[in-house]
């Protein structure tokens, strides 16, 4: 299961290494700064597509996610109450 807090912290650390402000990164990704903040703080999990775009922008090796025991769920949603990922029904 994807640990939103670990993933968010990893994204935030890599963003800071690149000396990017949240507003700059959010604009480059075509998302709001508040949504990026929610991702970095573990409140929301990005979709696989969004995570891939983030990884490209900040040079994040997606294999690092496996090493930190973070597993990505394809196009899943995030249940804030349960703090878990869930698959969307087709």
UniProtKB/Swiss-Prot annotation:
| Top-rank taxon | Viruses
Q: Where is the HTH cro/C1-type domain?
A: 11-65
* DNA-binding keyword on record: yes
Record-linked Gene3D superfamilies: lambda repressor-like DNA-binding domains (1.10.260.40)
- Species whose genome carries this gene: Bacillus phage phi105
**What keywords were assigned to this record?**
DNA-binding
GO MF terms, alphabetically ordered: DNA binding
Q: Which residues form a coiled coil?
A: none
- The protein in question is named ImmF control region 10 kDa protein
